[in-house]
Design a protein with these regions (language model features):
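Class I SAM-dependent methyltransferase SAM/SAH-binding core
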Residues: 49, 54-98
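Short alpha-helix
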Residues: 165-180
Length: 204
């Protein structure tokens, strides 16, 4: 298999704005409730990091109205779009697994369907880093896998666009989180097609 991260980066680069168009056609309001929930637990002007921000819609656009927002994504094309879509926010092209921040840098971290694009072996270390980057009483909101699966799709969203995913089951994610030190504030299944994902809201 080609480098999984290269597959992800090239896939999102190839799709460009068509990635957002596809999901807006499916459900244009899919993130509204969870973004409101995230804002409600954060203090005004909180420092927030998004892992896998894509084109900045809707998360960066929404959060940057209320908090000091920073987004990272592996796709340069998506980051260019994000800078246009949320001009008051700060963005960086980066591999989320290679990020380095001082401890206690953020009040909140959000990752919607993004960490599951990392190889599974790299995910526990990223969650440990996220815990360290959070300030006391900080929050991590993430949507991860519901079942164990690693694979690719060579025709994702449109013909010829490749994509890679890797995730474990929800109980294993929860075990990781509690071992790291997170408190589980909320967990629920997010249906999608014939399967779905798992929402977690965690507190340090």
């Amino acid at each position: 298999m080609k480098d999984p991260k290269r597959i992800v980066q090239q896939g999102y680069d190839r799709l460009g704005h068509r990635y957002r168009t596809h999901y807006e056609q499916e459900n244009p309001h899919r993130y509204e409730d969870l973004l409101r929930t995230f804002i409600q637990v954060l203090s005004p002007n909180a420092d927030v990091l998004e892992l896998g921000c894509a084109d900045g819609i809707p998360t960066a656009q929404y959060l940057s109205q209320y908090v000091n927002y920073q987004g990272v994504d592996i796709s340069p094309i998506q980051i260019n779009l994000a800078r246009r879509n949320a001009p008051s926010a700060h963005f960086e092209v980066a591999d989320m697994a290679a990020l380095v921040f001082p401890d206690r840098s953020f009040d909140g971290i959000i990752a919607l369907y993004s960490i599951i694009h990392l190889p599974l072996a790299e995910q526990p270390a990223l969650f440990k880093s996220a815990y360290q980057w959070l300030r006391p009483n900080g929050y991590l909101l993430c949507i991860v896998g519901a079942g164990e699966w690693t694979g690719t799709d060579s025709n994702w969203i449109e013909p010829g666009t490749g994509m890679y995913w890797s995730h474990t089951d929800a109980d294993t994610y929860q075990t990781w989180f509690t071992h790291i030190g997170f408190a589980i504030l909320d967990r629920y299944f997010v249906p999608e097609g014939d399967g779905g994902h798992t929402y977690f809201l965690l507190n340090k």
